[in-house]
Curated annotation (Swiss-Prot):
GO molecular function: NADH dehydrogenase (ubiquinone) activity
EC number: 7.1.1.2
GO cellular component, one term: mitochondrial inner membrane
Entry membrane topology: Multi-pass membrane protein
Catalytic activity: a ubiquinone + NADH + 5 H(+)(in) = a ubiquinol + NAD(+) + 4 H(+)(out)
Role, per record: Core subunit of the mitochondrial membrane respiratory chain NADH dehydrogenase (Complex I) which catalyzes electron transfer from NADH through the respiratory chain, using ubiquinone as an electron acceptor. Part of the enzyme membrane arm which is embedded in the lipid bilayer and involved in proton translocation.
Membrane spanning stretches: 1-21, 29-49, 61-81
PANTHER family in the record: NADH-UBIQUINONE OXIDOREDUCTASE CHAIN 4L, NADH-UBIQUINONE OXIDOREDUCTASE SUBUNIT ND4L
Source species: Hylobates lar (Lar gibbon)
Signal peptide: none
Protein family according to the UniProt entry: Belongs to the complex I subunit 4L family.
Source taxonomy: Eukaryota, Metazoa, Chordata, Craniata, Vertebrata
Protein name per Swiss-Prot or TrEMBL: NADH-ubiquinone oxidoreductase chain 4L
Length: 98
C-alpha cells in the first residue's frame, strides 16, 4: 500500500476515533464528520485518477455535494439547539421526548 493511501486511511481512522470519543457535543461531532468526508473525498479522487474510468470520475463531485448538505443540516441543527437550550449537547436532539 503506498504511503499516501495509508496516510488518508489513518486520517479517516483518527476522525472516526474522534467521533467515538467526542460524541457528547454536536460541534465536535460535526468536525469529525467533516474530517471523515475530506479523507473520503481525497481517497475517491485518487482512485478516480488511477482507474481512468469515466463513470467513477463523477464520484468525488457527488461526495462533495453530500458533504455540503451534511454540513448545512448540521450547522442548522447546531444553531437551533444553541438558541433553544444554550448548549450543543447531542442528548438534546432526542426527538422522542414530548
Amino acid at each position: 500500500m503506498p504511503l499516501i493511501y495509508m496516510n488518508i486511511t489513518l486520517a479517516f481512522a483518527i476522525s472516526l476515533l474522534g467521533m467515538l470519543i467526542y460524541r457528547s457535543h454536536l460541534m465536535s461531532s460535526l468536525l469529525c464528520l467533516e474530517g471523515m468526508m475530506l479523507s473520503l473525498f481525497i481517497m475517491s479522487t485518487l482512485m478516480a485518477l488511477n482507474t481512468h474510468s469515466l463513470l467513477i470520475n463523477i464520484m468525488p463531485v457527488v461526495l462533495l455535494v453530500f458533504a455540503a448538505c451534511e454540513a448545512a443540516v448540521g450547522l442548522a441543527l447546531l444553531v437551533s439547539i444553541s438558541n433553544t437550550y444554550g448548549l450543543d449537547h447531542i442528548h438534546n436532539l432526542n426527538l422522542l421526548q414530548c
